[in-house]
């Protein structure tokens, strides 16, 4: 099989895993391929960010920018099936409500939402709206969204490289992530994230890269202390928190 065709199939697998966008039904699947598709998780973020920016631009033709942002956020939730928000909620419930490792993992698998999860999700959505409305008047607002979607997924996906998977891999929907990430996957993720960051300019890009390094270090230490590793929900939580952090950094820069 030609290399480009194989890479395209891996990208399609990444798209199907992280969004509800249709991909060719003929795309072959295996746990090994899904694990290799991790190299394109950040690039999927680029695609999702571009689609969200298009929705915002179109909605802005008819509505005030605040309404356009709400519509864009709603579209993003539909686009991903609230995949990452669900992970953030489950992570908050499990780590917040469980006193032992087993209890935390059990709570994270529970489909019901608890106090910690609902409070965290509410604050995340409100925060995202406030941060985006603060940035909306910037000339490169659309690029900021694409960068946030890309870099946040790059950082979250790199956690697979050097952290143990602690969930039950036989029943988890993130089972392919239980396999170790290769240096090739890691390098592609880092390169994608770095290119996205510096697209906003070298100075801002370096600041975002520094923030990404610090966030990953702190989040990894926190997960190791609480869970001893990561779960699929933790990756979703990392993406959401990192995205919010990127918006905060950008707000600090433009103020």
UniProtKB/Swiss-Prot annotation:
Recorded catalytic activity of this chain's protein = alpha-ribazole + adenosylcob(III)inamide-GDP = adenosylcob(III)alamin + GMP + H(+); alpha-ribazole 5'-phosphate + adenosylcob(III)inamide-GDP = adenosylcob(III)alamin 5'-phosphate + GMP + H(+)
**Which Pfam families does its entry note?**
CobS
What family name appears in the similarity comment?
Belongs to the CobS family.
Membrane-spanning ranges: 43-63, 64-84, 113-133, 141-161, 195-215, 234-254
UniProt keyword Membrane present? yes
The name on file for this protein is Adenosylcobinamide-GDP ribazoletransferase
Q: Which InterPro entries match?
A: CobS
What Gene Ontology terms for biological process does this UniProt record contain? cobalamin biosynthetic process
User: What organism does the record attribute this protein to?
Assistant: Vibrio vulnificus (strain YJ016)
User: Where in the cell does this protein reside?
Assistant: Cell inner membrane
What's the name of its gene?
cobS
Top-rank EC class of the record's enzyme: transferase
- Pathway, according to UniProt? Cofactor biosynthesis; adenosylcobalamin biosynthesis; adenosylcobalamin from cob(II)yrinate a,c-diamide: step 7/7
Q: Which cofactor does it need?
A: Mg(2+)
Q: Which EC numbers characterise this protein's activity in its record?
A: 2.7.8.26
GO MF annotation, one: adenosylcobinamide-GDP ribazoletransferase activity
Q: Which UniProt keywords apply?
A: Cell inner membrane, Cell membrane, Cobalamin biosynthesis, Magnesium, Membrane, Transferase, Transmembrane, Transmembrane helix
């Amino acid at each position: 099989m030609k290399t480009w065709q194989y890479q395209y199939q891996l990208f399609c697998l990444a798209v199907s895993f992280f969004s509800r966008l249709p991909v060719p039904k003929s795309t072959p699947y295996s746990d090994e391929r899904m694990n290799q598709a991790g190299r394109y998780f950040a690039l999927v973020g680029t695609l999702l960010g571009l689609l969200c920016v298009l929705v915002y631009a179109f909605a802005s033709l008819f509505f005030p920018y605040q309404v356009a942002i709400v519509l864009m956020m709603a579209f993003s939730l539909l686009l991903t099936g609230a995949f990452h928000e669900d992970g953030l909620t489950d992570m908050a419930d499990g780590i917040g409500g469980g006193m032992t490792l087993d209890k935390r993992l059990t709570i994270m698998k529970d489909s019901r939402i608890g106090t910690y999860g609902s409070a965290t999700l509410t604050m995340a959505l409100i925060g995202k709206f406030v941060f985006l409305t603060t940035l909306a008047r910037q000339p490169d607002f659309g690029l900021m969204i694409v960068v946030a979607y890309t870099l946040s997924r790059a950082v979250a996906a790199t956690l697979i490289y050097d952290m143990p998977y602690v969930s039950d891999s036989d029943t988890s929907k993130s089972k392919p992530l239980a396999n170790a990430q290769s240096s090739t996957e890691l390098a592609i993720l880092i390169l994608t994230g770095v290119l996205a960051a510096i697209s906003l300019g070298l100075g801002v890009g370096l600041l975002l890269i520094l923030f990404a390094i610090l966030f990953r270090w702190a989040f990894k230490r926190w997960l190791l202390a609480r869970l001893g590793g990561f779960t699929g929900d933790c990756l979703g939580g990392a993406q959401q928190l990192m995205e919010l952090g990127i918006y905060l950094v950008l707000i600090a820069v433009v103020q």
